[in-house]
Amino acid sequence: MNITIPKLVIAILLLLIPALILYRLDRRFLRMASIVIARLTITLIVLTACLYYVFLWDKTWVNILWVLLTSGIATSVYCKRRWQKIPIYISMTVVTFVFGILVLLLIDASHLFSAPFFIPVMTMLQAEALFVCRRGITTYVLERRQHPELMEYLKGNGASKIEALRPFLTKAITRAFTPALSLLLLVGLVFMPSLLCGLLMGGFSPLQSVAFLAIMTSVALCSTMLTLVFTIYIYTRIS
């Protein structure tokens, strides 16, 4: 793949087409979209510069530090409430690290902590866990605040604390994973996952690409479920 500056400029100029359409239809939305694209551009420039040196150095401690920093920044930006950030960051970092190493072992990576393998795998696992966990812990907290009498009723009828929390945990898991499972139903039927497209464009065979996608999907579902459970556990302990 050989993408030159002129080719990149041509691709960016294509944004003028939707911009002209929005200019005629909704200028307020155009301003909002322009701000989002400008922020995205700045983020990509900074990210590219950082990743260039991270991949250039390719040292174990640098790669681990990069994953810890990016996951912390992503958690702070995506999770608006303070009570979401600490439980999600701790559980996500620990669980995805363990399962990320498992993925690297399963795909027989030449070096577990090399940047081309370690950083993409950890990033994909943490992104999925972050989206699901924020939705899950928000549901859990809101359900407990809206129905405090249910927990007291269950405890009054002899249920332990864990048993009394079970309805709230069930609701959190159900709501958190429903969108993810719905998306999986469309894979292969309506669209091809971007990960699979990237592997095919990178020269991997269809068999190896699908095998890696299957491994990542299985591990992501498992690690995300455990991350959500540990997130709720940590929140319950510190709240």
Describe each PLM feature range:
Residues 3-11, 62, 66, 83-135:
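Loop-to-helix entry region at the N-terminal start of transmembrane alpha-helices
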Residues 14, 18, 47, 70, ...:
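Alpha-helical transmembrane segments of multipass membrane proteins
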Residues 19-31, 73-84:
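C-terminal ends of transmembrane helices
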Residues 28-67:
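Loop-to-helix transition at the N-terminal end of transmembrane alpha-helices
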Residues 139-172:
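Short cytoplasmic-facing helical segments at TM-TM junctions of multi-pass membrane proteins
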Residues 164-190:
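Transmembrane alpha-helices
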Residues 182-207, 227:
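Non-cytoplasmic
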Residues 206-236:
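Hydrophobic alpha-helical transmembrane segments of polytopic membrane proteins
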